[in-house]
Every structure is written in structure tokens, then in C-alpha cells.
Amino acid sequence: MSRPAQKRAFGVAAGLPEEVCGPLAAAVQDAGYDSIWANDHPFAKGLETLAEFAGAADDIDLGVAVIALDRQGADVIAEDIKRLDLDPARLWIGVGAGFSKKPLTFMTERISELREKLPGVRLVMAAMGPKMCALAGSSY
């Protein structure tokens, strides 16, 4: 039985200086990585970092993990993707409940909203615990 080729991802910290992103993205792509991922932080948006990588590495996917949906809703994420001219077909967006009071209810509502507002974007859900894992599994 043959196994599918292993995918390789490269992770960076959001907020890297612009002059670092282009050369690093090209090197990551040339090294055979399939995607570049950035974290998201209140003081450095992962999508903005990925936009710096997008032009220099046009053959690999771009991912951000994890955007706390209690800080940024689907409208803000969609606006950022449009403003930054990111191709939805290249994007992976990791999302989590953040510090919401009822995380299961919160994520149940937000996932359908995200799917509606972010067509073509691949979503992954941060899930800790059996109930959130079950929700993540039923959402995909």
C-alpha cells in the first residue's frame, strides 16, 4: 500500500519585517514546502504577513492559525482578504473561539457565517476537548 506524499509546511511569526518576507518566501518555495503559515496576534495580523509572502511564493498555499473569532469576525476577515488581494483558493484559515463565554455555541454560529462570507477558503478549527473536536469533525 503506497502512502500519499507528505505535505510540508513552514511556519513564521506574524509581523515579520517586509524586507525579510520576500526572500524567505522564495527560499521556502524553492526548498519544496507546500505552504507557509503565520500565527495571528492582536498586534500583528497573520493575513498581513501572508500577503507579504504571496507575491514571492506564488506556487504554495498560505495559512493563518489561529484567528480568535471573538476578536475578528467573518466580515473583518473577508475585508482583510479582499484588501490584501489574497487568492481564496490559496488560503487556509485556522479559527478558534478565543475567550468566548460559550465556545461550542459561538463556534457553531460562526462556522456557517465563515463559510458564507469566505467562499473558496479552506477552514480549520482549533479544537480542544471532545465536544469541540466533534463539532470540528461535523463541520467539515
Place the predicted regions along the sequence by residue:
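N-terminal beta1-alpha1-beta2 module of alpha/beta enzyme domains
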Residues: M1-D61, V121
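Internal, glycine-rich beta/alpha segment that forms the wall or movable "lid"
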Residues: S2-R8, G73-Y140
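Glycine-centered structural positions embedded in regular secondary structure
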Residues: A25, G63-A65, G137
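Active-site beta-loop-alpha junctions enriched in small/polar residues
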Residues: A13-P17, H41, I67-L69, G96-S100, ...
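Alpha-helical scaffolding within the catalytic cores
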Residues: K45-L50, L69, V76-D80
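Short, conserved beta-strand segments within well-ordered enzyme catalytic domains
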Residues: W37, D61-A65, W92-G94
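Short hydrophobic interaction/assembly module
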Residues: I60-V76
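Secondary-structure boundary/capping motif
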Residues: V20, K45, Q72-G73, P103
